[in-house]
């Protein structure tokens, strides 16, 4: 919550005006907006891709580790050196996948809530059918390992996801928002994709519709994190 600043009608209209045949929505940790998103896409002739940017526990959803330091995109570091949670992009390929996303979202709230609704490897294995997964953004398990210089750990995490979702349904995700960490890790992600024979997927981390909305979105993030616009 307090992350996306787009209004659905404006977002879908922008996609339609750009000639985009499809548009995906992956809200953080929930599927509250799925129905309205689906209806709006259908009304404007854009194919809806339903998904969720899930929060994944480091290992088990029952974990309740102590946090140390500042809150960041992954909730912050734990005393054990891990993260409170990681980001994982999940997309419904078909009706089976849609129903499995509902299961994952619901169980993350009911069984894994700790700062955020978290799922884990066990739930992913049980409800993987009909779902396409990606390695995710800088907050993902794979990239967090790369940012720590742990290329073997990143490869292992990516391999584990590929094993769960299947070779055809797991993608290595690449993003370029001008962020140095992305420039540094994208070649490493390409290498992981080659080693796993996994397909690549280029994405854009969209949180607002128009360029001029960036200041309002910045203020929204400050409300979420308890910081100020003056902070870097």
Can you say where each PLM-predicted feature lies in the sequence?
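Phosphodiester-processing cores and adjacent nucleic acid-binding clamps
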Residues: 1-232
């Amino acid at each position: 919550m307090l992350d996306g600043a787009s209004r659905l009608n404006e977002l879908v209209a922008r996609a339609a005006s750009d000639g985009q045949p499809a548009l995906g929505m992956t809200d953080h940790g929930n599927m509250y907006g799925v129905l309205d998103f689906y209806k709006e896409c259908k009304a404007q002739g854009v194919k809806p891709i339903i998904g969720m940017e899930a929060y994944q526990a480091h290992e088990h959803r029952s974990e309740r580790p102590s946090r140390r330091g500042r809150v960041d995109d992954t909730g912050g570091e734990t005393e054990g050196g891990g993260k409170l949670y990681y980001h994982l992009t999940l997309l419904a390929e078909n009706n089976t996948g849609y129903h499995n996303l509902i299961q994952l979202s619901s169980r993350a709230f009911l069984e894994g809530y700790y700062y955020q609704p978290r799922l884990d490897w066990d739930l992913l294995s049980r409800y993987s059918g009909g779902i396409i997964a990606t390695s995710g953004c800088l907050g993902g398990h794979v990239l967090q390992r790369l940012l720590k210089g742990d290329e073997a750990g990143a490869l292992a995490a990516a391999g584990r996801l590929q094993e769960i979702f299947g070779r055809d349904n797991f993608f290595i995700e690449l993003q370029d928002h001008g962020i140095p960490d992305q420039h540094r890790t994208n070649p490493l992600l390409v290498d992981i994709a080659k080693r796993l024979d996994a397909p690549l997927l280029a994405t854009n981390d969209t949180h607002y519709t128009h360029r001029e909305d960036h200041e309002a979105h910045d203020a929204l993030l400050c409300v979420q994190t308890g910081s100020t616009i003056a902070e870097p």
